Amino acid sequence: MTVTATETIRKEIFVDASPETAFRVFTEQIAEWWPLGKYGTFLEQADSVVFEDRDGWALVERAKDGRETVWGEVLDYEFSSRLRMTWHPGRSADEMPTEIELTFAADGDGTTVVLEHRGWERASDEVRTARAGYDAGWNEVLETYRNAS
């Protein structure tokens, strides 16, 4: 099967934690596990990434020199089961109109976490060229998350 630059990226992992813990690690402890030096806007100048309330929740990356950029805004969530947000690190939501959705489902003694990164069909050709990098990058990011959970 040939993958086009507009298909939804879908990743699924199992974490050895309850859905509540898995959700909290992703949202409340993201600064502790996200590989900012490789997957961040500021790279080696990155200082932190955190969800914060800005008249609605947003995921914000900060650089050591005080600069900041919003990676995305939370559209909706259900604690311990679902998180959906816009996704546009280093760009405006208009430039990169993609979104991610994570679901957290109890699975035996752990949780199955599914990430879908969609909306590529609304993106410009320039943004679509980043899709392959995200497809590979989400594997590494989620493995780092799994190890932290």
Model-derived regions, located:
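A structural signal for short, well-ordered beta-strand segments
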Residues: 9-13, 102, 115-117
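Hydrophobic ligand-binding cavity/cleft-lining segments
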Residues: 1-45
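A conserved amphipathic terminal alpha-helix motif
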Residues: 91, 118-149
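Short beta-edge strand/loop motif at the mouth of beta-sheet-based domains
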Residues: 28-69
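Hydrophobic-ligand binding "helix-grip"
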Residues: 50, 60-109, 118
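Hydrophobic pocket/interface hotspot
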Residues: 22-23, 59, 74, 85, ...
